[in-house]
Amino acid sequence: MLIEIGRKIQQARKIRRITQADLGNALGISRNTIGQLERGTVQDIGVRKLIRVLEFLGLELQTRPAGRPPTLEELRDEEIR
């Protein structure tokens, strides 16, 4: 799950042409932590910081029951983003 979230963060950041350093500076988070977050290897970023990163990039966190595959609608929404 963290790898998927990180991949989405990296995609959104690159689309907006923001460097890891610029994103980190804007949010008070180190470039190293942003890199770890994008790779899915961050140890403990905290939910509040994660949400700040997501909101800054125009993303939101969604949940679904564990083990349930995504619906066609969810997959379609994913492609649109």
Where are these regions (language model features)?
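A detector for short, charged/polar N-terminal pre-domain segments
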Residues: M1-E4
